[in-house]
Amino acid sequence: MAYSCAYWPEGTTADLAAAQRAKLDLICAKLRLRPGDRLLDVGCGWGSLACHAARHHGARVTAVTVSGQQHAFVAARIAAEGLDELVDLRLQDYRDPVGGGYDAVAAVEMGEHVGAAEYPAFAARLRDLVRPGGRVLVQQISRGAHRPGGGAFIEAYIAPDMHMRPLGATVSLLEDAGLEVRGVEAMREHYGRTIRHWLARLEAQWPAAVGLIGLERARIWRLYLAGGAQVFEDGRMGVDQILAVRPGVGAQ
């Protein structure tokens, strides 16, 4: 289970699950994960990256989340997949002690929830957690310089803590923190496609969704997904993978 943008390699017509796996493969490839590498997954969500990196790349993963519900879900998933020796799951804030010297650090659609005032400290924390020469990948939603971020609807009903900025502003903040940005991949079209898949699944399971969260809440999510797909398709919002390294010995 994943709640972030999937990825369809050019020319593919894969289903959503395969596209999510392709996104995870893309992240792991950019981070150049090798067996035994230490990966920190900041805001690990439902555990898809942590489990994928451990199972398919042999990474030793530390995954952190502040959500008790996500922690319980991921813990069960780790046990079911037999990954207890490779994934260290922690219920904590990324600012709390979590070790250091990681070969790679990933933050997948977590930075939007940090807040404008806290983002410089967030970027500095990413730099401090990765070893010199290590890689950092930030996947994050962006907006145009003169366009609103989440907007009143999202802030009221979906994600009151969401803050988005232009891509260039995020790159500057990462560079100001001492990271060297090596590459950016824009994935806007992929998010429109991802959300259309989510909306189709919601419609297909509409009675179950209403039974689970009630009619009003289900309608809010239907409107959110329909509008969200449209703003990505229209280019009013984007999503980008930003790859950076901490300068030092071993940087490539």
Predicted regions mapped to residue ranges:
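A short glycine-rich, Lys/Arg-flanked "PGG" loop and its adjoining helix->strand segment in the class I
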Residues: P120-P132
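Substrate-binding/catalytic lobe of Class I Rossmann-like enzymes that use SAM or dcSAM, i.e.
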Residues: S142-Q252
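Conserved SAM-binding loop of SAM-dependent methyltransferases across substrates and taxa
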Residues: W46-H57
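Conserved beta-strand signature within the Rossmann-like core of class I S-adenosyl-L-methionine
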Residues: G133-Q140
